[in-house]
Each structure stands twice: as structure tokens, then as C-alpha cells.
């Protein structure tokens, strides 16, 4: 189990990042950049409310909290849609910051009092929750118009030439899908339980699809020919007027990114495409999207040892030697930038850079047991969602694993999502 010292470090790192993302004036925090997203001040107070609920009140909403019930209810994500939150009588930014600080002080006291053999999972869950909201706030900030508020604080390594369009073989046979709490104590409920599945051999892209490759799709009329699209995808394309990835400007040579207008790097993984677009691109390219089971095998399975790797590259914790994570770069890295991060089959950039769409709907693994936060996964099973894998440049390294499962509606584009192709053999 993760030590109290490590948990305290991860809590501090997440909070420092959160506060950087709300280090703006009140008007900025209280406005809504897009109906798809909450005002930043809602996310800030929601982070504190969930931390208080799980770490100070044992997950019992009936137990008195620091906020009046009517105020606390404003931060129930199931009761209030993102579009409606700007109209709610939310805490002011100053009160939200003060509330979060008060909760954090008490949470650290609770962590210090945790017995040596105590169950620290709920702390890991709260750390994951805050970091996931930090990525959500980055999505909101990317939708903002006007002069830039954010600037990258980390440089990216150079890519390698002739990586786009290449693929690697993933051998057929059984592998262990998912994880158990004993091996990954911080894993969330939908990642469990570990179980053996058989996967036929296939090929998978060595790297994600690039902007340059996507431009070829556009130039070849990919957005104007229904033959590449599913029936539902084509209907959505027509209704939404899609002609290029979100944030690409007319003409396809420049884009907006966090308020900056810039040239589109040809060797960077494409992002801000929906599942429908990813599906159409794959058909045009003579390929398909991987299932999430295929994706996890390509990422984590080592046929030489007949066992899972904790990370694609092995057991070492994620660093900028292996992957582009942590949100400091504000963009994906060029393909081929992380050869040391390759998986056993040779696939690169499986973690970080862009979330990767799979064909899989969100379903529980056999033996699924909901965690203490029962509404994390269960309400979304069987819904209109597609699973995304691998994380993005905006994900905190401490919460990401090959088994981590994200999901969203197939029409979503504001997320930092891209594409990796697969082929039958």
C-alpha cells in the first residue's frame, strides 16, 4: 500500500496544480467558457467537497459537514449539469479557496492518524479525483477565447523521422487483463479484477496518428465522403458541420491552443477528434480502431516473461524519459519522442500525449465490485460511451496505469483525445 508520506506528497502535488489552474481573477473563475464545461470556481469547490465527504465524513452525506446541505448540494455532479452550473449560487473564489484549505488541513491530520495497517485507498481515490478535475479544467481553459492565460513550463524532446504510419505485431494468445488490488492498490473499481483473456494476433500502430496524416485524410475528402463513416457518425458529422479536428482553423494549417494561434506540427499526434471521426479515419486508412482489450495487451503484456509490466517500459515510475505527462507541456510530443517508453511489442507513447479511442463500450470486468464511491463507474455501464486508454499530456503520472479506463460520449471533441490504429492479420 502507498505510504502516508507518498500520499501526502501526491495530495500536495495535486493541490499545487489545482491552485495554479485557478490563479486568475474572480471574473475569470466565475464565467463559463463553454456550456460543455463548468465555471472553474465550481470545479475548485467540488474538489474540496469530495475530499471532505470521503476523507472527513467517511462517505456519509448525512453526516454534518463544513457547508450547509443546500450549499453542498450545488456541487453534486449528478444533480447539476455542467451547462447549468454557472447559474447556481456558488461559493465565491475566496470562499472556495478557504474551504479547500480547511478541508485539506483536516485531511492531512486524518492521514497522519491513519494506523500503519490502515486502508489508505480512499486517499488514493481522492488524489485521483482531484487530478482528473485538473485535466477537466485544462479542457475548459482550452475552450476559452481571448489572450492566453497559460504557457508551457516544460520543453518537449524531438521526435524521430519515419515513425508515422508504422506498426508492430502483437502476438496472439492469452494475457492477464485488468489488475487486482493486491498488485495495484490504488487502482479503481473498473480496472479490477485481473482475469485471463485470449486475444488473436493483430498489428497496432507504433505511434498515434499524426496531424500530417490527418491532413491527408482531409485533403482526400475524408470529411465529405459518407463511405468512410458509420451511419450514426455521418449523421453527426453533418449535423455538427465537422470539417477538421476541433481548434483547427480554416485552411487546416494553423490552430488555436490555449489562446495561442500557431502552425499545426505535422509530426504531433492529432487531438480533439471524436470517436466518430477516429472511426472514419481508420476506415479511410484501411485499418480499424483497437478494442480496449487489444490496447491493454499491446501496452502491458510481456510475452517473454508471460506477465504484465507495471508500465509499458517496465517497473520504473513515469518520468519525462518515458512519457509526456503532468500537464506542463500543454501539448502532445512529436511521435518517436520517447523510445525508452516502448512496450514489449514495440508500441511507443502508449501512456501520455493523447487519450486513444477504442471501439469498446464501458462494461464491468468479471468479478466487478464497486468501490466506496459507488457512482464512479456503475452509472455509466451500458450507456452511450466509448472507452479511451493511455492518458494524455494533461494526466498526472501518479494516477495513470495501463489498466486505467476513461470513457466519454462518441461525439466529444474537447477532450485531449487522438487515435491509434489496429489491423487484423
Curated annotation (Swiss-Prot):
The domain of life is: Bacteria
Locate the residues binding gamma-L-glutamyl-L-cysteine: 82-85, 408, 412
Q: Which reaction does it catalyse?
A: gamma-L-glutamyl-L-cysteine + hercynine + O2 = gamma-L-glutamyl-hercynylcysteine S-oxide + H2O
Ligand binding (Fe cation): 46, 129, 133
Q: Output one GO MF annotation.
A: gamma-glutamyl hercynylcysteine sulfoxide synthase activity
Write down the EC number.
1.14.99.50
Q: What class of enzyme is it?
A: oxidoreductase
Which pathway, per its entry? Amino-acid biosynthesis; ergothioneine biosynthesis
Looking up Pfam families in the UniProt record yields:
DinB_2 (PF12867), FGE-sulfatase (PF03781)
> What Gene3D superfamilies would the database entry show?
paralog of FGE (formylglycine-generating enzyme)
Q: What induces it?
A: Expressed in log phase, part of the egtA-egtB-egtC-egtD operon, which does not include egtE.
Give the protein's cofactors.
Fe(2+)
Query: What keywords tag this UniProt record?
Result: Iron, Metal-binding, Monooxygenase, Oxidoreductase
Output the NCBIfam families linked to this UniProt entry.
egtB_TIGR03440
**General function of this protein:** Catalyzes the oxidative sulfurization of hercynine (N-alpha,N-alpha,N-alpha-trimethyl-L-histidine) into hercynyl-gamma-L-glutamyl-L-cysteine sulfoxide, a step in the biosynthesis pathway of ergothioneine (ERG). ERG is one of the major redox buffers which protects bacteria against redox stressors and antibiotics; loss of ERG or mycothiol (MSH, the other major redox buffer in this bacteria) leads to respiratory alterations and bioenergetic deficiencies that negatively impact virulence.
Provide the family line: Belongs to the EgtB family.
Instruction: Please report the name of this protein according to its UniProt entry.
Output: Hercynine oxygenase
Q: State the encoding gene.
A: egtB
Amino acid at each position: 500500500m502507498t505510504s502516508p508520506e507518498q500520499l501526502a506528497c501526491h495530495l500536495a502535488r495535486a493541490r499545487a496544480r489545482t491552485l495554479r489552474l485557478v490563479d486568475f481573477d474572480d471574473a475569470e473563475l466565475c464565467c463559463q467558457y463553454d456550456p460543455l464545461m463548468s465555471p472553474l470556481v465550481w470545479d475548485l469547490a467540488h474538489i474540496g467537497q469530495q475530499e471532505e465527504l470521503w476523507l472527513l465524513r467517511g462517505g456519509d452525506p448525512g453526516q454534518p459537514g463544513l457547508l450547509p446541505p443546500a450549499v453542498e448540494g450545488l456541487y453534486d455532479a449528478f444533480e447539476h449539469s455542467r451547462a447549468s452550473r454557472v447559474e447556481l449560487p456558488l461559493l465565491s473564489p475566496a470562499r472556495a479557496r478557504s474551504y479547500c484549505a480547511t478541508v485539506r488541513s483536516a485531511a492531512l491530520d486524518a492521514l497522519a492518524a491513519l494506523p500503519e495497517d490502515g486502508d489508505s485507498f480512499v486517499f488514493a481515490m481522492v488524489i485521483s479525483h482531484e487530478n482528473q478535475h485538473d485535466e477537466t479544467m485544462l479542457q475548459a481553459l482550452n475552450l476559452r477565447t481571448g489572450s492566453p492565460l497559460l504557457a508551457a513550463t516544460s520543453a518537449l524532446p524531438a521526435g524521430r523521422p519515419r515513425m508515422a504510419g508504422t506498426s508492430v505485431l502483437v502476438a496472439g494468445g492469452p494475457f492477464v487483463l485488468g489488475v487486482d488490488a493486491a498488485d495495484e492498490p490504488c487502482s479503481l473499481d473498473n480496472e479490477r479484477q485481473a482475469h485471463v483473456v485470449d486475444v488473436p494476433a493483430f498489428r497496432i500502430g507504433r505511434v498515434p496518428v499524426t496531424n500530417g496524416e490527418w491532413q491527408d485524410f482531409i485533403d482526400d475528402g475524408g470529411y465529405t465522403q459518407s463511405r468512410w463513416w458509420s451511419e450514426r457518425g455521418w449523421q453527426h458529422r453533418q449535423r455538427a458541420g465537422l470539417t477538421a479536428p476541433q481548434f483547427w482553423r480554416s485552411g487546416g494549417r494553423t490552430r488555436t491552443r490555449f489562446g495561442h494561434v500557431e502552425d499545426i506540427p505535422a509530426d504531433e499526434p492529432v487531438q480533439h477528434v471524436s470517436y466518430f471521426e477516429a472511426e472514419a479515419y481508420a476506415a479511410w486508412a484501411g485499418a480499424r480502431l483497437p478494442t480496449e482489450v487489444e490496447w491493454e495487451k499491446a501496452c502491458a503484456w510481456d510475452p517473454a516473461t508471460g506477465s504484465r509490466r507495471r508500465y509499458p517500459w517496465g517497473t520504473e515510475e513515469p518520468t519525462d524519459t518515458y512519457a509526456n505527462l503532468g500537464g506542463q507541456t500543454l501539448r502532445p510530443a512529436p511521435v518517436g519522442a520517447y523510445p525508452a517508453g516502448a512496450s514489449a511489442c514495440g508500441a511507443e507513447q502508449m501512456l501520455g500525449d493523447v487519450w486513444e479511442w477504442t471501439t469498446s463500450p464501458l462494461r464491468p470486468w468479471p468479478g466487478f465490485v464497486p468501490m466506496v464511491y459507488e457512482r464512479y463507474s456503475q452509472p455509466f455501464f451500458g450507456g452511450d460511451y466509448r472507452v479511451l486508454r493511455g492518458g494524455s499530456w494533461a494526466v498526472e503520472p501518479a494516477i495513470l496505469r495501463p489498466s486505467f479506463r476513461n470513457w466519454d460520449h462518441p461525439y466529444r471533441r474537447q477532450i485531449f483525445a487522438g487515435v491509434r490504429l489496429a489491423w487484423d492479420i
